[in-house]
Amino acid sequence: MNSIHGHYHIQLSNYSAGENLQSATLTEGVIGAHRVKVETALSHSNLQKKLSATIKHNQSGRSMLDRKLTSDGKANQRSSFTFSMIMYRMIHFVLSTRVPAVRESVANYGGNINFKFAQTKGAFLHKIIKHSDTASGVCEALCAHWIRSHAQGQSLFDQLYVGGRKGKFQIDTLYSIKQLQIDGCKADVDQDEVTLDWFKKNGISERMIERHCLLRPVDVTGTTESEGLDQLLNAILDTHGIGYGYKKIHLSGQMSAHAIAAYVNEKSGVTFFDPNFGEFHFSDKEKFRKWFTNSFWGNSMYHYPLGVGQRFRVLTFDSKEV
C-alpha cells in the first residue's frame, strides 16, 4: 500500500514569484464526492496582496508554545511558503465542516468523547500548515504517537498541550509528531517502515501470529468499496484470542489516504482515535461497530471512492506496557 503523506495528493501549477500573472485558476478540485470548480480572475496587484496576506498568516502570530526550542535545542519546523499550502487549507476547511456531525453521533450509539481534537482547524492546523511536508496533515504520525501514549497509560493530549488543555503546545511533542511525518515523506522512503522503526524504538512491536509454521505480522488488507465495511471492522475488532490489541488503520481511495487508530479490549471496549475528529470510547465492540457502520463512515465522508473509501490496511501492535 502507498505511504500516507497526508490527506490529499494534488497537482498544482508552479508559478514563479516574478511572473506577471493576470489570473490564477484552480480547476476541478475534488473533495470527497464534492466537485468544486473555482475560477478567480485577479489583477497583478490584487494577487500580490492576497499572497502577501497568506504568507503573513502562515509565518507570523503568537507562538502558543511552552518554549521556543525543544529540550535538545531544536526549533519548531517550518519551510518556505508554497501554493499547495493554500489548497490544503481549503481541503482542511471542508473536512472540518464534518466535525460536528461526527461528534454529535457518538452519544447516539452509546459512546463518549474523550477529547475533542481536529488537525483540520484551529491552532494545531496553524502549526502544521507551516511546513510543506506536514501541511496536508500528519495523521500517520499522530496515530503513532497516540498508540505510544495510550500504551504507556498516558494521554497524547496531556503530552501535546500544557496542562492537557488546548491553548499552549508542549514543543517537544509537537516537534516529534511533525518530524515523524517529515521523515516519512522523504524521497525513496517507505513511510510504513519509518513508522515501524519509530515504534520499535518506543517499545511498540508488530503482533506476530503463526501461519504455516512461521511467525508473521498481523497485516490485513481489503476493499471497502465492493466488500462493504464488514471485513474492515472484523480486522479492527479482532484481538486474535489475546483479548486486546492496538490497531493502526490505513484508508485510501483515488485521491487521498488517511490513518486512524484504535485500542480494542474485550473487557473494556474500543477507544478510537481519528486525527480529524478526536478520541472516542465505546464500552463494547458491538456499539462501536454500529456507530462506525451506520454513522461515522458516512458523516466523515470517508465512504467516497474519490476520498478514502476504496481500500484499507489494518496492522496490529503490542506494547511492553500492556
From Swiss-Prot:
Functional description taken from the UniProt entry: Cysteine protease, which is translocated into infected cells and plays a central role in pathogenesis by cleaving the C-terminus end of the human small GTPase RhoA/ARHA, a regulator of cytoskeleton. Once cleaved, ARHA loses its lipid modification, and is released from the cell membrane, leading to the subsequent disruption of actin cytoskeleton of the host cell.
Predominant place of localization: secreted
EC number from the UniProt entry: 3.4.22.-
InterPro entries referenced in this protein's UniProt entry, alphabetically: Papain-like_cys_pep_sf, Peptidase_C58, Peptidase_C58_Yopt
Oligomer status and interactors: Interacts with human ARHA.
Result after altering H258A: Loss of function; abolishes the cleavage of ARHA
Stated name of the protein: Cysteine protease YopT
UniProt KW keywords: Hydrolase, Plasmid, Protease, Secreted, Thiol protease, Virulence
Gene Ontology cellular component list: extracellular region
Residue ranges of the TM segments: none
GO molecular function: cysteine-type endopeptidase activity
